[in-house]
Amino acid sequence: MLDVNAKPTEEIDLREVFGLDSDMKVKGFAERTSRVPEIDPTYKFDPDTTMAILAGFAYNRRVMIQGYHGTGKSTHIEQVAARLNWPCVRVNLDSHVSRIDLIGKDAIKLVDGKQVTTFHEGILPWALRNPTAIVFDEYDAGRADVMFVIQRVLEADGKLTLLDQNEVITPNPSFRLFATANTVGLGDTTGLYHGTQQINQGQMDRWSLVSTLNYLSHDAEAAIVLAKNPTYNTEKGRKIINQMVTLADLTRTAFMQGDLSTVMSPRTVIAWAQNARIFADNVGYAFRLTFLNKCDELERQTVAEFYQRLFDEELPESAAVKAG
């Protein structure tokens, strides 16, 4: 259980904790609770996105993080919350999440041997009552009925009316609201993100801050993959990691030029490095199982050629092997 009266009292040194050259005053909670995310000591913070998230926590701004999949949008919010000891819950707004899931519903309970109908609160009323941050993942994939529930909470006072209960919930002073999205509310123009919707512009206006999180620089990404896979911390291992990240960069460039429809995220590179160890350091086999088999069949030859260029090894999918 969270203490509804808990307040953030500990001033955070942004230079020391996040490496930010900023005088913004941000306070966190003194104690960690079970709802506070675990700290990932290897996490690399994007300065602009971190500032937006910190402003959200410090000044109760509504913050949306937009970017391609695998850039670490949700994790970014969680890792900031972890260092502020701020309780945080993530809700994935897939097409199965309904208004009832968010608001709550009547449920039958046994009380003194009798069946009694009581209102079972959903995640949103619970979050509003507590000093917690709620993160709506895949915000642009939410159903229309769900989006209109969230729209009311996005307003300045953020009160939520439970019509069934004749109750108006006033948010806890330490309640915070964040969202992540692959698109920025204008629908998917790339064809990559099936199921995403255009977001009502009246609703987009209610987000105080919108930050774009792009892929990391080559060196920063290689450092993260290495931190997640310390067994590669040898001269040969570091070279392999660098080649893996370079291949990921090639897929992203090809994607932006319209030559590929599948892109390698940092998450995929980390998985590739881990899988290569599982398969007795067979980097090519691990690459095929981790990424290549996810690609469109017509694009696999192009991706296999990227691999051959970097690792000097022909894969079964490459043009040279097929021609032979």
What residues fall within each predicted segment?
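AAA+ P-loop NTPase catalytic core and its hallmark functional loops
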Residues: M1-R238
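Alpha-helical lid/collar subdomain of P-loop NTPases
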Residues: M1-T33, Y43, T50, S217-A222, ...
